[in-house]
């Protein structure tokens, strides 16, 4: 920000907030809809409740302060819950969207024993993670988990169906998201870690277009620094903008900050549509 014109930044400072705190400060009301996902309106109250439940469930799965949580999800509500839950327990999300071998390498280096992926992960992919890293099990998230199935148009259902292999991951090493949350209810210990805005929160990998793919680490401090400098234009009493996000993967920090957290923090309605094909974006824009 030192390169910005002085008149633009003279009254701008980076808040000393966690991501959870920043979103709460900019929440227009707990009964206001924060996210729309395939026919379901998700209120701010539900977002905060799910962040708490996810944090407890992560503790119940053995994650703690300083741990890395590998997440291979599209931009579904569960990704938001995992990000906020990870911050609460002092852990960081590890996201990579490269080849299977590169993804396994990232998990191996993280030493994580549990990974998160959609339920269209194949049994063969799960076997590869278990064989070549310390992965013991995967928590699977259905694209339909937070959606209203009857409200999903046919072209979106078809696009989702195309992701499923002949043999999706199954058995005792594949744990459903809702069971993951249920098991977390039994965790009796302390959930939240000491507050630290400079602790690693989000780990992403570069594309590798200019050399070997490298991990880049972001904290709440750096993420909010980027978020806050863009958070000028929000809703008004007369008009609340909508923000449609389609196929961009949340394995990039720019997507997480600028495309997910920014609309939420500036009182825009975030519409998550991660399974829309690029050629169907016009259909979705007309729908919303």
PLM regions and their residue ranges:
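AMP-dependent adenylate-forming
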Residues: 3, 21-43
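Conserved AMP-binding A3 loop
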Residues: 43-45, 192, 201-228
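Conserved pre-ATP/AMP-binding loop-to-beta segment of ANL
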Residues: 31, 158-205, 212, 236-243
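Structural core segment of the AMP-binding/adenylate-forming
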Residues: 88-179
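Conserved coil-to-alpha-helix start sites within the AMP-binding
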Residues: 73-84, 98-101, 247-265
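Conserved AMP-binding/adenylation subdomain of ANL enzymes
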Residues: 90, 224-243, 250-288
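Conserved AMP-binding/adenylate-forming core of the ANL superfamily
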Residues: 33-84, 100-104, 218-221
């Amino acid at each position: 920000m030192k390169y910005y014109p002085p008149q633009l930044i003279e009254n701008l400072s980076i808040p000393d907030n966690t991501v959870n705190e920043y979103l709460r400060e900019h929440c227009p009301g707990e009964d206001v809809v924060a996210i729309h996902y395939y026919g379901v309106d998700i209120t701010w109250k539900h977002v905060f409740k799910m962040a708490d439940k996810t944090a407890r469930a992560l503790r119940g799965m053995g994650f703690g302060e300083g741990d890395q949580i590998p997440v291979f999800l599209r931009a579904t509500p569960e990704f938001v819950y995992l990000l906020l839950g990870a911050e609460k327990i002092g852990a960081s999300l590890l996201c990579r969207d490269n080849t299977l071998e590169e993804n396994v390498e990232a998990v191996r280096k993280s030493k994580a024993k549990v990974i998160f992926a959609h339920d269209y992960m194949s049994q063969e992919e799960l076997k590869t993670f278990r064989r070549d890293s310390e992965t013991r099990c995967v928590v699977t998230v259905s694209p339909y988990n937070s959606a209203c199935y009857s409200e999903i148009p046919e072209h979106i259902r078809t696009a989702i169906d195309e992701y499923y292999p002949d043999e999706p991951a199954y058995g005792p090493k594949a744990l459903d998201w809702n069971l993951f949350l249920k098991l977390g209810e039994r965790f009796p210990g302390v959930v939240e870690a000491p507050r630290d805005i400079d602790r690693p929160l989000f780990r992403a990998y570069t594309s590798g277009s200019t050399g070997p793919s490298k991990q880049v680490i972001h904290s709440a401090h750096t993420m909010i620094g980027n978020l806050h400098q863009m958070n000028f234009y929000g809703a008004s009493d007369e008009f609340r903008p909508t923000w449609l996000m389609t196929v961009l993967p949340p394995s990039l920090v720019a997507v997480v900050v600028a495309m997910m957290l920014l609309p939420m923090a500036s009182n825009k309605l975030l519409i998550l549509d991660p399974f829309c094909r690029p050629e169907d974006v016009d259909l979705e824009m007309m729908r919303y």
